[in-house]
């Protein structure tokens, strides 16, 4: 069972009953993570890349015996906290009984797949995309958008056959008519069992298009309505 709390933008807290996994902490208007830290909960911070809307250097303030940091290799944290590992796309890590694989990105950094207990085949799994998306900008040049498509196809191909329980993926309003393209290609390749969660909206809440619903009407979707919303899967 996973309890998911939307912090803001692309930031999420995922609790599995033992640990608190914090993905791309940018801001936490409701001080949810601080409350957990004060209660001595085990906090694992995942940082996909250094963009200011995915990485807040203040996460070093949570450092302590119950805190770990798992970061893309470009994130400058390793010398500033006690327990930090850095990863690059294609790399695996095993920390305690938690399995982590870093997939690629179509922008900076990488994306995370987390298996909460590698000793139990039925344990929960989490995918956080970071800035992995099909970044097709309607006002951009045909050449740039062709490059964006090639990059997206290259990274999505690595995900073929993956199954996850909860997946957090960008559905960015700034892409206008192309805002769902990345999520469509992602879901064509990845089986999401419990919740597909849109993030990185940069605008109003997402209403899935008729086309999206026709393709993925059976995919469970949870869309947070505001910072601090939570659900259990």
Predicted feature locations:
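Binuclear metal-ion centers of metallo-dependent hydrolases, dominated by the metallo-beta-lactamase
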Residues: 4-10, 81-95, 158, 179-233
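Active-site-proximal beta-strand elements of phosphoester/diester hydrolases
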Residues: 3-6, 21-24, 98-105, 123-131, ...
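Metallo-beta-lactamase
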Residues: 68-123, 218-233
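Pre-active-site segment of Zn-dependent metallo-hydrolases
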Residues: 11-50, 57-61, 132-161
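Active-site neighborhood of phospho(di)ester-bond hydrolases with catalytic His/Asp-centered motifs
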Residues: 22-26, 41-55, 70-74, 127-131, ...
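Active-site HxH/HxHxD metal-binding segment of metal-dependent hydrolases
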Residues: 32-93
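Active-site environment of divalent metal-dependent phosphoester hydrolases
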Residues: 28-31, 50-55, 75-79, 91-93, ...
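Active-site-proximal loop/helix segments of hydrolase catalytic cores
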Residues: 108-189
């Amino acid at each position: 069972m996973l309890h998911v709390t939307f912090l803001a933008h692309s930031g999420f807290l995922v609790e599995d009953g033992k640990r608190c996994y914090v993905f791309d902490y940018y801001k936490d208007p409701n001080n949810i993570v601080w409350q957990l830290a004060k209660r001595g909960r085990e906090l694992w911070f995942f940082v996909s890349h250094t963009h200011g809307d995915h990485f807040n250097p203040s996460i070093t303030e949570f450092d302590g015996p119950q805190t770990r940091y798992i970061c893309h290799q470009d994130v400058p944290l390793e010398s500033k906290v006690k327990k930090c590992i850095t990863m690059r796309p294609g790399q695996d890590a095993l920390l305690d009984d938690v399995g982590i694989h870093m997939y690629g990105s179509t922008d900076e950094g990488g994306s995370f797949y987390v298996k909460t207990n590698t000793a139990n085949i039925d344990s929960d799994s989490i995918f956080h995309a970071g800035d992995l998306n099909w970044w097709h900008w309607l006002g951009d040049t045909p050449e740039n958008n062709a490059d964006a498509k090639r990059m997206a196809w290259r990274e999505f191909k690595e995900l073929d056959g993956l199954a996850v329980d909860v997946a957090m993926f960008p559905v960015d309003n700034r892409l206008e008519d192309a805002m769902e393209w990345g999520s469509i290609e992602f879901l064509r390749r990845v089986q999401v069992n419990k919740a597909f969660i849109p993030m990185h909206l940069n605008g109003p809440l997402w209403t899935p298009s008729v086309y999206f619903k026709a393709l993925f009407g059976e995919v469970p979707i949870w869309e947070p309505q505001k910072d601090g919303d939570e659900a259990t899967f």
